[in-house]
Amino acid sequence: VKILFFALLALLSGCNGWTNPERAIFEKYHQRLANVLDVPPRELNEVSAITIPDKRALYQELPRLSLGLLESYQLRQCGLFNLIAEKNSQLGKVQDPFHDLDYQTTLLNTLNGCLTEYPLSEDERTTLTRLYEQKWQHLPVHLDNVLLTSETMRKQLTASSWLSAKSRNQTAHVSKTFHALNAMYETPKGVISRLPSFSFVQYQEEMEKSRLMGKVYFTLNSTSEWLDVTTKLLEENQERIVCGKNRDTTQFRYLKNVFQSIYVEEVQPYLAFVDSTYQQLNDGAVLIEQRMELHGESYGVIKAHEQFRTKTLEHVKFWQGLFKRCGVVVGNSPTP
């Protein structure tokens, strides 16, 4: 029974590293350096989960189109009546923002077709022209509701776990979705040919289950924190590090070994992966920040990436300074 108890205790104590191999790399790196320096590891500030403002602070309600004057024969012929009637049905009223965005592009195309291809009375043309202009004005609002308030995107933008190296195949899809949304925002008012011919719903499932942007953001914060405390650990104890001729360089050689075997072989490749993933999502990050700012809110991932770069560079500079002081040229010298 005692053996079973201690085995279970060991298993539980190792769960964090076992379930989170990315964090485990940084824990190992920090602990090994502390061991070599013969000092306790520094206390780490736990990183908060990535959240976004409440949906109510970001959602914008827009008026529904009523059938009103649209019940004429011509408007039935051009497809407008049936399209709006379907939207006003029980199912249409509960469409999520992705489906609603598809409806808005279909509506703009249908309105344009009615105005350009069907004989209309003066009243009908006046009404449809007003609706057409109104729907173009509303398009950025519908896009904001997709980007900032849909359940899909709120899941995509939030996270409390590290970016896994196994998520490489998700990046292209998420990046493509942000590019498509960005292109929609940049569509000139009234230029029907610039509206997408595809359905936005096709992007929904992958965006919802990946949480890629949120994980990148959480990982930028987490790696910045680990690099910061590790750099401080080294800086505060650099007087302990002895090197030079006729000196006992055992400790320095151990540190160099930790640098080579853990930083160069494990930490640095992961940092490069995180940075590369962020770069591929940069257009999406900029778009989110811009649209949040218009609502008086902020997301913060761009600043998190800047901090990540700063902390990485500070850590690299410590090692470069130490190796220079000790007259050592490292084959794979650290790079930011």
Give the predicted meaning of each segment.
Residues L12-G14:
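C-terminal motif of bacterial Sec signal peptides marking the signal peptidase cleavage site
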Residues T19-R168:
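N-terminal Sec/ER secretory leader and immediately downstream segment
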Residues T127, Y132-G284:
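Extended amphipathic alpha-helical interaction segments
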